[in-house]
């Protein structure tokens, strides 16, 4: 079992951290994030690093310990570097376009699908078959990218649909052309 919760979280230069009870606020060059954590977790900040401590070795507290540490680390990485997910559209006539803040997808339905990104999410469309979702909140970026993918998930026969750029689609063989019924 990993002991990730015990590792201190280094705070880089230019990042401001405020810990008030169970609420942690992180401000950095890309923006600021605030999150409420479980009341059992003790979070301390000594100027250069953040430490997360658990009250006991119960299973629930062990799980929360690692989770809390990782969430705080994700906040720090988000406000310094940000997060991004890239998707690609595979299929004839499948394309994405940006209209103002909206994302418009043409993916084989009788109508174009319009999507409004949540606050704090930025969308780029470098090519008509590529979408890049950017933001400082890892959870929001992942959720919105998954929502886009869910509009037309890749199918296993031809691979048509919206997929993550690094995703590998498991393909299936089609029906073999045998003799038909008479």
Swiss-Prot record:
Which UniProt keyword terms apply here?
Ribonucleoprotein, Ribosomal protein, RNA-binding, rRNA-binding
Per its UniProt entry, which superkingdom is the organism in? Bacteria
Which residues pair up as cystines? none
Q: Which InterPro entries match?
A: Ribosomal_uL6-like, Ribosomal_uL6-like_a/b-dom_sf, Ribosomal_uL6_a/b-dom, Ribosomal_uL6_bac-type, Ribosomal_uL6_CS
List the Gene Ontology MF annotations in alphabetical order: rRNA binding; structural constituent of ribosome
Q: Name one GO cellular component term.
A: cytosolic large ribosomal subunit
Q: What does the UniProt function comment say about this protein? A: This protein binds to the 23S rRNA, and is important in its secondary structure. It is located near the subunit interface in the base of the L7/L12 stalk, and near the tRNA binding site of the peptidyltransferase center.
Among its keywords, does the record have Ribonucleoprotein?
yes
Transmembrane regions listed in the UniProt entry: none
Quote the Pfam families the UniProt record gives.
Ribosomal_L6
> How does this chain assemble?
Part of the 50S ribosomal subunit.
Q: Which family does it belong to?
A: Belongs to the universal ribosomal protein uL6 family.
One GO BP on record is: cytoplasmic translation
Protein's UniProt name: Large ribosomal subunit protein uL6
